[in-house]
């Protein structure tokens, strides 16, 4: 049996000025689903990076589109960001970027691929498919234990 979910689809021009629309939409969806503030902030960075990569690299001089699909599940949000532009080899780029070395100053981090490194760090799962264009599928699980009651009621009254 297929898992039930709701789907929200959007298309925007692959221009920097439209990335904020996607970021705000995602934040609204995640808030409604019950995500914690920090998780929403992480997802805002991740979706901004995915869209910005498309704006900067996918279409060269042409202006294409970015397709975004939000899959709303009971326990997670899946975000698909896709383009039909120029593709690249994610695994090769990932090897070049490598793990973050805390001893290196920020100025010495490689610029290419840092966005994908951030996405990989901030999301629970990331899958990248590249045939004609690029599709990034990012998943973030709702951490319900952050908002559940721990069984210790808090009182505003002082005990004497």
UniProtKB/Swiss-Prot annotation:
UniProt cross-references to Pfam families, sorted A to Z: HATPase_c_2 (PF13581)
Transmembrane stretches, start-end: none
Keyword check for Protein biosynthesis: no
Cited NCBIfam families: PRK04069.1 (NF003144), rsbW_low_gc (TIGR01924)
Job of this protein: Negative regulator of sigma-B activity. Phosphorylates and inactivates its specific antagonist protein, RsbV. Upon phosphorylation of RsbV, RsbW is released and binds to sigma-B, thereby blocking its ability to form an RNA polymerase holoenzyme (E-sigma-B).
Homology family: Belongs to the anti-sigma-factor family.
Name of the protein in question: Serine-protein kinase RsbW
């Amino acid at each position: 049996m297929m898992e039930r979910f709701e789907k929200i689809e959007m298309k925007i021009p692959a221009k920097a000025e439209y990335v904020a629309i996607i970021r705000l939409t995602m934040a609204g969806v995640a808030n409604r689903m019950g995500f914690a503030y920090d998780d929403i902030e992480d997802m805002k960075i991740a979706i901004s990076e995915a869209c910005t990569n498309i704006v900067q690299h996918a279409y060269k001089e042409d202006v294409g589109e970015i397709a975004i699909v939000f899959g709303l599940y009971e326990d997670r949000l899946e975000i698909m960001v896709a383009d039909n532009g120029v593709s690249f080899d994610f695994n090769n780029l990932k090897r070049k970027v490598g793990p973050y070395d805390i001893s290196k100053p920020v100025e010495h981090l490689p610029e290419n691929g840092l966005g994908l490194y951030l996405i990989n760090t901030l999301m629970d799962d990331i899958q990248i498919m590249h045939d004609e264009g690029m599709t990034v599928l990012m998943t973030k699980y709702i951490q319900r234990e952050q908002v559940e009651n721990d069984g210790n009621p808090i009182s505003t009254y002082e005990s004497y």
